[in-house]
């Protein structure tokens, strides 16, 4: 069985990933599962560059196939903020409840049609032979007026999906994986792992 490391320590993200890649004949490990404690500086200028930096570094360290993602929220009215800084927005130790409240506050008085946003996910697959494949996907929506929903994590409770009439935190894991930015990107990279 092929071993694949997904370069994350985020258990919520790993749950989502295992759901989508679970039918592949691979042993899928998180950094924690693989016993890796690497502090990689993500200094790329795009989601793609950051994913590639992470995947390459862990692949070189382990000699295994490594998947890494960089994802975030782009809000059009805020010039695509928080963008590649989504995880570090307002500081890494700031809870998403506080981050979400701040974004809602920054959009106070902004009408629905100008609250457009997207979740973006870039996934890089680094292989021991030095090759790399990168994909990018997005999920379009808008920023809601309050947090809603218990499923998901991060900015999900404020990311409203008009066609579903709810936030991404109100979708089941199965529903979310069908339409999410990460789900789309994982399905796009899946063939590289067969």
Please name every model-derived segment.
Residues 2-5, 11-194:
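Anionic-ligand binding patches
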């Amino acid at each position: 069985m092929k071993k694949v490391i997904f370069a994350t320590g985020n258990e919520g993200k790993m749950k989502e990933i295992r759901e989508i890649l679970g039918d592949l004949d691979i042993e899928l490990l998180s950094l924690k599962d693989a016993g890796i404690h690497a502090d990689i500086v993500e200094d790329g200028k795009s989601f793609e560059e950051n994913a590639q930096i992470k995947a390459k570094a862990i692949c070189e360290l382990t000699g295994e196939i490594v998947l890494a993602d960089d994802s975030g929220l782009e809000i059009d009215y805020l010039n695509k903020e928080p963008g590649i800084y989504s995880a570090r927005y307002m500081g890494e130790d700031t809870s998403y409840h506080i981050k979400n409240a701040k974004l809602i506050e920054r959009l106070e008085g902004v009408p629905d049609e100008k609250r457009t946003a997207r979740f973006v996910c870039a996934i890089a697959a680094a292989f021991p032979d030095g090759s790399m494949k990168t994909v990018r996907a997005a999920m379009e929506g808008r920023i809601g007026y309050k947090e809603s929903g218990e499923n998901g994590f991060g900015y999900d409770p404020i990311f409203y999906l008009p066609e579903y009439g709810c936030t991404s935190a109100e979708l089941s894991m199965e529903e979310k994986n069908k339409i999410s930015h990460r789900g789309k990107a994982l399905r796009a990279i899946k063939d590289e792992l067969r």
